[in-house]
């Protein structure tokens, strides 16, 4: 029977000083000896996805206390990728993921916590906490801040338009849109607290924690503003105490993150990710989490899943034939359990999985899938939680309900396998001489007319150079924009390329150009945007050898990407570089913190994790 980790500080005469400090921080004498649950919050006023989380920590802590354990709350950092986008701040986004993982580890290990509950939400916070959970392998539950409501703007001509953050970025460079309309779009694109309203990185990852079995049903889709989310926080607090007692009092190791997050669970997570056309960043983060779990899982495994799973849902920034769906629409369609149910009925899930709330997948779907299960009235009520359509930065500020659910499996937000948007899933891994170790593309956001594409390269040594060329109208239809030295080492920090892709879209080039990079893309990216080229340029990848005018061929159906230059010429170019792989004429200030990250960073095919063996 495992002993409570906290016994190290709660028992024995020699630890009187530690207990004195615990009493000073508010722990009552009667509570010393109970399980200590670390409550990892991520409240910050910088990020709309986190600005409402201050009271959430208290709600979760009160539920933990009532269930018989001792909550101890602390905060991690949280970077807003949207605010950091388009300038040097984006260099810090991906490295913050690993810093968050470390900070959670430091707090849990330093204070001998017995279990962990992670209150996350936005782009790097959920992945960082997921890495920490897999690293620590103590009982853990995730509960996120929830999605933002979709925006709605009335334009000057009276047109009412539903929108999100990406519209505010791409429309800003569309010269046909007036300044007044741009202001209205800006003012209404992000109307509430919560993670941005589409299937961008934050919401993708929060949905995937459901499939990995580490969060409760509804975690990825209940809106941040809805009162139903408060009940979710309370349930999460109770659940983490339940699984903590199962582990320490019943020796039940099945509740540990590595027992839940098995290869089968990762396969199911990728199946859902591919079916819903999630952010390409999810691939990066799942690979990193698998590495922390000491689980052999790589791009080849992901590619195998992508070959058999169709695209069943298209949520912004992906556009469905009938219009654009948002996270509130996913929720109305039954949330992640409904999408899992469709995959299960299609024979596309591994059934040998469990979660923090259900012992089997069958139990999970029976209780929560509104399409094929037999959910309770309370579960059905959860899926009726609707947007309030009122600007608010406050959690639990509204309790609107949908009159009906979207159960249309043929033409609704979530389709069945028979009516899939495409037989190919929403994400794909490409390989070829330009990316020997692989690269990724969000096929759900690519017009099928350009799934095969060939064009001349326009080489950019940085994201900034690419933006300048796009805005100066130097990019022509048919071009392949190549942005290199933006990988984990080369950036350093592997910047997101939302501005270049959004500006291509705003210039009307989104369906007639391609973009290839060793950097990465925002979950809000659409178009033929291929990222994570590995090895990256700074590690001597072929992308470092590309020259202006070289032809590049992209073939999504056959999962290939080729630089149409013969091997002898590439060898000559490599010899000319003389082992120096660095950008030309790039003026960029790189801090000591970023240099430290770059010294250990691996390429994207390994999740851009740090390899401490590089330290010697």
From Swiss-Prot:
Q: Which of this chain's residues are annotated to bind [2Fe-2S] cluster?
A: 122, 196
Residues that bind Mg(2+), according to the entry? Answer: 81, 123-124, 496
- Which PROSITE patterns did the record assign? ILVD_EDD_1, ILVD_EDD_2
Which reaction is recorded as catalysed by this protein? (2R)-2,3-dihydroxy-3-methylbutanoate = 3-methyl-2-oxobutanoate + H2O; (2R,3R)-2,3-dihydroxy-3-methylpentanoate = (S)-3-methyl-2-oxopentanoate + H2O
What GO cellular component term, any one, is given?
cytosol
What's this protein's function? Functions in the biosynthesis of branched-chain amino acids. Catalyzes the dehydration of (2R,3R)-2,3-dihydroxy-3-methylpentanoate (2,3-dihydroxy-3-methylvalerate) into 2-oxo-3-methylpentanoate (2-oxo-3-methylvalerate) and of (2R)-2,3-dihydroxy-3-methylbutanoate (2,3-dihydroxyisovalerate) into 2-oxo-3-methylbutanoate (2-oxoisovalerate), the penultimate precursor to L-isoleucine and L-valine, respectively.
Which GO MF terms does the UniProt record name?
Answer: 2 iron, 2 sulfur cluster binding; dihydroxy-acid dehydratase activity; magnesium ion binding
What InterPro entries does the entry give? Dihydro-acid_dehy_C, DihydroxyA_deHydtase, DiOHA_6PGluconate_deHydtase_CS, ILV_EDD_C, ILV_EDD_N, IlvD/EDD_N
Task: Tell me which residues bear N6-carboxylysine.
Answer: 124
Q: Which UniProt keywords apply?
A: 2Fe-2S, Amino-acid biosynthesis, Branched-chain amino acid biosynthesis, Iron, Iron-sulfur, Lyase, Magnesium, Metal-binding
Q: What is its EC number?
A: 4.2.1.9
Q: Which family does it belong to?
A: Belongs to the IlvD/Edd family.
- Which cofactor is recorded for it? [2Fe-2S] cluster; Mg(2+)
**Any one GO biological process:** isoleucine biosynthetic process
**A Pfam family it matches:** ILV_EDD_C
At the highest ranks, the source species' classification is:
Bacteria, Bacillati, Actinomycetota, Actinomycetes, Kitasatosporales
Q: How does it assemble?
A: Homodimer.
- The entry's protein name is Dihydroxy-acid dehydratase
């Amino acid at each position: 029977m495992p002993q409570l980790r906290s016994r190290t500080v709660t028992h024995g005469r020699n630890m009187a000083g530690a207990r004195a400090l615990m009493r000073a921080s508010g722990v009552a004498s009667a509570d010393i000896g109970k399980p200590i649950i670390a409550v990892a919050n991520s409240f910050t006023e910088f990020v709309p996805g986190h600005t409402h989380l201050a009271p959430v920590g208290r709600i979760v802590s009160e539920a933990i206390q009532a269930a018989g354990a001792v909550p101890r709350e602390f905060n991690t950092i949280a970077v807003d990728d949207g605010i950091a986008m388009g300038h040097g701040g984006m260099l810090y986004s991906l490295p913050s993921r690993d810093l968050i993982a470390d900070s959670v580890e430091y707090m849990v290990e330093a204070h001998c916590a017995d279990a962990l509950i992670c209150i996350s939400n936005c782009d790097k916070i959920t992945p960082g906490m997921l890495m920490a959970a897999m690293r620590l392998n103590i009982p853990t539950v995730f509960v996120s801040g929830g999605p933002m409501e979709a925006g709605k703007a009335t334009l000057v001509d009276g047109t009412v338009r539903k929108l999100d953050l990406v519209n505010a970025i791409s429309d800003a460079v569309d010269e046909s849109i007036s300044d007044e309309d741009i202001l209205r779009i800006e003012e209404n694109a992000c109307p509430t607290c919560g993670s941005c309203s589409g299937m961008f990185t934050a919401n993708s990852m929060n949905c995937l924690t459901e499939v990995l079995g580490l969060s409760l049903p509804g975690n990825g889709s209940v809106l941040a503003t809805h009162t139903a989310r408060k009940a979710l926080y309370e349930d999460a607090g109770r659940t983490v105490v339940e699984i903590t007692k199962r582990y320490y009092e019943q020796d039940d190791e099945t509740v540990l993150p590595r027992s839940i997050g098995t290869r089968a669970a990762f396969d199911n997570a990728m199946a859902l990710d591919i079916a819903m056309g999630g952010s390409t960043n999810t691939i990066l983060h799942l690979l990193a989490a698998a590495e922390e779990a000491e689980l052999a899982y790589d791009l080849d495994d992901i590619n195998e899943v992508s070959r058999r799973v169709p695209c069943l849902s298209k949520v912004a920034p992906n556009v469905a034939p009938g219009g654009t769906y948002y996270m509130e629409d996913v929720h109305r369609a039954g949330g992640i359990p409904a999408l899992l149910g469709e995959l299960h009925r299609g024979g596309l899930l591994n059934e040998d999985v469990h979660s923090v709330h259900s012992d089997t997948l069958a139990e999970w779907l029976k209780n929560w899938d509104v399409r094929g299960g037999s959910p309770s009235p309370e579960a059905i009520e959860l899926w009726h939680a609707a947007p309030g359509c009122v600007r608010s930065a406050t959690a639990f500020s509204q309790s609107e309900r949908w009159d009906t659910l979207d159960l249309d499996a043929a033409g609704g937000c979530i389709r069945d396998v028979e009516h899939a948007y495409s037989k190919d899933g929403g994400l794909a891994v490409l390989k070829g001489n330009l990316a020997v170790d692989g690269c990724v593309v969000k096929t759900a956001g690519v017009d099928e007319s350009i799934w095969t594409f060939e064009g001349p390269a326009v080489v950019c040594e940085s994201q900034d150079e690419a933006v300048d060329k796009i805005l100066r109208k130097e990019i022509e239809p048919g071009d392949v924009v190549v942005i290199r030295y933006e990988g984990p080492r080369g950036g350093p920090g592997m910047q997101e390329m939302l501005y270049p892709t959004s500006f291509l879209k705003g210039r009307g080039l989104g369906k007639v150009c391609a973009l290839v990079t060793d950097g990465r893309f925002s979950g809000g990216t659409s178009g033929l945007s291929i990222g994570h080229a590995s090895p990256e340029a700074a590690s001597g990848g072929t992308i470092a050898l590309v020259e202006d005018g070289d032809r590049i061929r992209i073939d999504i159906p056959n999962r290939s990407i080729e630089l149409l230059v013969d091997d002898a010429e590439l060898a000559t170019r490599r010899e000319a570089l003389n082992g120096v792989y660095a950008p030309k004429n790039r003026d960029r200030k790189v801090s000591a913190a970023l240099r430290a990250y770059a010294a250990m960073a691996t390429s994207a095919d390994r999740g851009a994790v740090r390899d401490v063996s590089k330290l010697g």
